[in-house]
């Protein structure tokens, strides 16, 4: 057997072209699986390899990071204690490992005392750190229980905060920050919307640069169409056409 040259190849044995992976969004034994906006036109929507090959938006696992830097990105990845590691995040050409997100919640490699690797975690989807989802509404677009935002190492979206400085950029309380970061503070902190409701973490297959830039791919379990049947984001016009948490966006600009 030819040995894997990259860590992700081991993960792809089950999570890429395998016919045995879950094929619907109701699969929730190990955490709720979002049903994304683009899935309706895809033949294999849960194929992580195809997500990460995206030319529209993806995390840099199988492809190197681009030269442009997300304004929320930290200089260095944080360990479980909140200390910077030696892993640089900014600049082109860097890679992430699957185990940067999917790992033991006490992994030694992240400063903990447990084993390294995705063997077990107290968090859904074998995540190393906390990541909350919105609860299912009665119908997509209607109001639903949502996780109140808490900051810090054990905060609501700690896995995002490992690389993105949430509280000093995206979720800063300052009015200017909510403008610069396009209402992330309003949505996440004030209105308790999960990151997952709007963003797909791996990458986006079948999307476009206008509708799916910045890993935007709405979870259709939570988000419904507007009163004209539209459900999409226009990044050129900075406008959302949808209904979410009982609020009609027809459109709402950001």
Task: Name what the model sees in each region.
Residues 1-254:
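A motif-centric signal for short, conserved binding hotspots located
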């Amino acid at each position: 057997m030819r040995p894997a040259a990259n860590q992700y190849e081991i993960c792809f044995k089950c999570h890429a072209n395998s016919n045995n992976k879950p094929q619907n969004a109701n699969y929730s034994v190990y955490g709720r699986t979002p049903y994304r906006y683009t899935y309706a036109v895809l033949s294999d929507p849960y194929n992580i390899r195809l997500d990460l090959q995206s030319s529209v938006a993806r995390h840099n696992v199988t492809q190197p990071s681009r030269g442009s830097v997300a304004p929320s990105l930290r200089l260095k990845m944080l360990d479980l204690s909140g200390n910077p590691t030696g892993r640089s995040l900014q600049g082109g050409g860097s890679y992430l490992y699957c185990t940067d997100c999917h790992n033991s919640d006490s992994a030694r490699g992240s400063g903990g005392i447990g084993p390294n690797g995705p063997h077990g975690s107290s968090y859904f989807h074998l995540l190393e750190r906390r990541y909350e989802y919105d609860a299912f509404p009665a119908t997509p677009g209607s109001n639903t229980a949502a996780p109140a935002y808490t900051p810090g190492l054990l905060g609501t979206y700690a896995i995002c905060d490992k690389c993105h400085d949430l509280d000093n950029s995206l979720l800063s309380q300052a009015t200017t920050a909510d403008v610069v970061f396009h209402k992330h503070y309003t949505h996440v902190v004030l209105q308790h919307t999960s990151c997952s409701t709007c963003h797909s973490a791996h990458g986006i297959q079948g999307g476009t640069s206008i509708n799916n830039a910045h890993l935007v791919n709405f979870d259709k379990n939570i988000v419904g169409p507007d009163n004209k049947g539209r459900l999409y984001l226009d990044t050129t016009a900075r406008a959302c056409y949808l209904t979410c948490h009982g609020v009609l966006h027809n459109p709402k600009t950001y």
